[in-house]
């Protein structure tokens, strides 16, 4: 069966592993998934990310992060722009997630950026997902 939205599948796997309190998650790799995983690591939503090369497309290993009492660092992930309904944002209209407590992941001409980085670089693009 052909997967129509691999980004939504990646976010759903993270959400499900987070709900089940798993420590490690492995998903098939792609460039955009690597970019999203790197942003999640840089913003402190996950502990670590490893990129494993194999003879196929590779694997991304995501180490999920929890608080001292087991509380989830990632409250929710929401896919915004979907294959059936693309959502674009001009540089002036870049959304803030929970008044800056969360992040928006945006695909721009500069690559994958958070909403803060896109505002600093003054670029707009496709709003991939919200994370809070």
Curated annotation (Swiss-Prot):
Gene Ontology molecular function, alphabetical: rRNA binding; structural constituent of ribosome
Record key words, sorted: Ribonucleoprotein, Ribosomal protein, RNA-binding, rRNA-binding
GO biological process terms on file: translation
Alphabetical list of InterPro entries matching this protein: Ribosomal_uS8, Ribosomal_uS8_CS, Ribosomal_uS8_sf
Pfam entry (one): Ribosomal_S8
PROSITE patterns the record matches: RIBOSOMAL_S8
SUPFAM superfamilies xrefs: Ribosomal protein S8
GO cellular component, as recorded: ribonucleoprotein complex; ribosome
PANTHER family: 40S RIBOSOMAL PROTEIN S15A (PTHR11758)
Functional summary from the UniProt entry: One of the primary rRNA binding proteins, it binds directly to 16S rRNA central domain where it helps coordinate assembly of the platform of the 30S subunit.
Subunit structure: Part of the 30S ribosomal subunit. Contacts proteins S5 and S12.
Family of this protein: Belongs to the universal ribosomal protein uS8 family.
Name of the featured protein: Small ribosomal subunit protein uS8
